[in-house]
């Protein structure tokens, strides 16, 4: 991760936020229209959820899907095709995901891993459920501590608030959640924080 941090620090920094849903859909559909490549509506919806409309991750996913289209010579891609390429895209985007991770404090990392585990289990990602999971893992922390970590990650656009009034949080780019599940251990991060 240090290598990537050095590499990314030699370039000019430009904040790249997420695209609005309409612009993200156009980025998916318009470049391949002249090649007769069509995405199923469910595939486009899945692409938007996985990438959060972030142009970098959206481009990686489109790249993987166009490669699939070229290999299999199909003009219609489905949600199953998107699902089958997600692991590849996590690998392609690992440097950026690792950089976001390395720029997070150990406390933020603990919250990220707890949230990833909760969401993967179909549980709501609230401050209370995050606190409960961290406590089960041996890290008893206050809600204020969790709120501060979440607030910082919302400002950095790693996390976003879920539906209004639910108190839930989710990953802005769901690929981050998948990467965390594959490559990081909540137990090890909890030990570091303690």
Label for each model-derived stretch:
Residues 94, 174-194:
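Short, amphipathic alpha-helical interaction segments positioned at domain boundaries
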Residues 154-164:
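A short, conserved structural fragment
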